[in-house]
Amino acid sequence: MQTIILGGGCFWCTESVFLSVKGVESVISGYMGGNAVSANYEAVCGGDTGHIEVIKVKFNESTVPLEVILDVFFATHDPTTMDRQANDVGSQYRSVVFYTDETQKPTVDRTINKLRDMGINIVTEVHPAVEFYQAEDTHQDFFNRNPGQAYCNFAIPPKLAKLRKEFSQYMVS
């Protein structure tokens, strides 16, 4: 098993995407990368801690390689706009990859360089993982538990449609 931490806007949205990927064993929403000694939703959304909304993705690389995890990540959020994903604005929504093992960094760098070679201006930050603060229970598996939530119904279906179209062989049936 491998673990990688990804920040691509609201963690409700990124969580929903990766819960739909074969070989992903778990997805935990949380916070990382800040300067405060703890993190919670209210403080992070207030911009007071420097933390980023992230998901911790634990996956079986024999089923879904890290390259595919990263390709899905970059395809299902906007890695070209600083501190913003759709209507979510603020540094807590920035695009970031936190690698948990030094062997992951070359793959992350290759993936970003491949996109840049295609003329895409990637602003995604890349850092070694630091302390992860698990989000409150109300934020875990949010969309599945709140299917009527308006923001999720606006933001998540297009991401899942893109996943289905571009990565169907890796999508949970």
UniProtKB/Swiss-Prot annotation:
Its EC number is 1.8.4.11. Gene3D superfamilies: Peptide methionine sulphoxide reductase MsrA. GO terms for molecular function: L-methionine:thioredoxin-disulfide S-oxidoreductase activity; peptide-methionine (S)-S-oxide reductase activity. It comes from Psychrobacter arcticus (strain DSM 17307 / VKM B-2377 / 273-4). It comes from the Bacteria. The keyword Hydrolase does not apply. InterPro entries: Met_Sox_Rdtase_MsrA_dom, Met_Sox_Rdtase_MsrA_sf. SUPFAM superfamilies: Peptide methionine sulfoxide reductase (SSF55068). Keywords: Oxidoreductase. It holds the Pfam family PMSR. It is an enzyme of class 1 (oxidoreductase). The active site is at residue 10. Has an important function as a repair enzyme for proteins that have been inactivated by oxidation. Catalyzes the reversible oxidation-reduction of methionine sulfoxide in proteins to methionine. Belongs to the MsrA Met sulfoxide reductase family. One of its GO terms (biological process) is protein modification process. Transmembrane segments: none annotated. This is Peptide methionine sulfoxide reductase MsrA. It catalyses: L-methionyl-[protein] + [thioredoxin]-disulfide + H2O = L-methionyl-(S)-S-oxide-[protein] + [thioredoxin]-dithiol; [thioredoxin]-disulfide + L-methionine + H2O = L-methionine (S)-S-oxide + [thioredoxin]-dithiol.
